[in-house]
Every structure is written in structure tokens, then in C-alpha cells.
Amino acid sequence: KLLKVQEKEIYFTSGGTESDNLALIGCARANHRAGKHLITSSIEHPAILNTMHYLEEEEGFRVTFLPVDKDGRIRLDALKEALCEDTILVSVMYVNNEVGSVQPIEEAVQIVKNYNKNILFHVDAVQGFGKYRIFPKRIGVDMMSVSGHKIHGPKGIGALYINEKVKIKPIVFGGEQQKNVR
């Protein structure tokens, strides 16, 4: 209810890091036939940066790391230039955990979706969760990571919003909970 999405679009995880990993790896593996190019910013949380490096080094994806301006916001002109027909996913955090910059997510989503509506957009909203009113459907993102401890819940609880139209593959195997995704 807090995110204003359907219950079936919420996948509970062990925290923001697992949510980010599931979004990036699960999406990349499920959509690799459509393209092998991923985009993120150069100042993401290590859960994003390390996962992008893994996908680049171990699974053969090409990753573009967007530069930021003097205020720590992604350069939208660089995002426009980075998009190509091989791009399948863009991931940008909502609020930076070190410098506090709030990213222009709505504008970035518009740029991406105007280029190709099939490119998926993920937001790591862990730092902004509970502080900003972030509604994934309203801003047009396909996946969004959150963490319970940012809203006074215990550590070790997180969630990933995945729009019901998004194809994703599991990264943990053996259980059948949450539609075999986790």
C-alpha cells in the first residue's frame, strides 16, 4: 500500500542488496537475447556497482557508467548519448547514500522510454524510502528496491517491486515461494 502497487508485484528479500541483485541479474539473464547493454551511474551504491561489474566481467554484458554533475546528479545528456538498440536496462538510485543528491528519475525515465519503451528502468530507492513519496507506477519505473530498516523496520528485510509485465529470472534456486522468483 505504501508504494501503491499490486501485492503480486512485491517480492520480499533479505534487504536492499538482494533486491538490487535480483533486479539487475534477474533482468539481465531474462532479457539477454534482446540486448547486452546496461546503464547505471558512476556513484551508485556498491550493491549496484559490484553487480554491474559482475555482469560485465562474468556474463559478458557491456555497462555504461554515467558521469554526474557537480551536485552529484546524473547528466541527462550522457544518458541520451548512452542509449542504443542493445540497451535492455537502466538502473539509477533515487537518493545517493553518500552525498545525498536526489536524482532526476522522472526525467530519466522519460528519456529512456521515449527512446525505447521496452528498456527496463530500475531504481534503488533504499535511501529515499520513507522520506520521499515514491510511487513506481506514477514515475514509470519497472523495478524498485527498498529496505525495511529505512522505515524503522528490522535489518534483513527488503522488497523489490517488479511490474507484472517484467520478465525476470531467479537468482536463488530451490524454493518455490514468490512465483519461483525467490
Task: Give the ranges of each region predicted by the language model.
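Pyridoxal 5′-phosphate
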Residues: 1-182
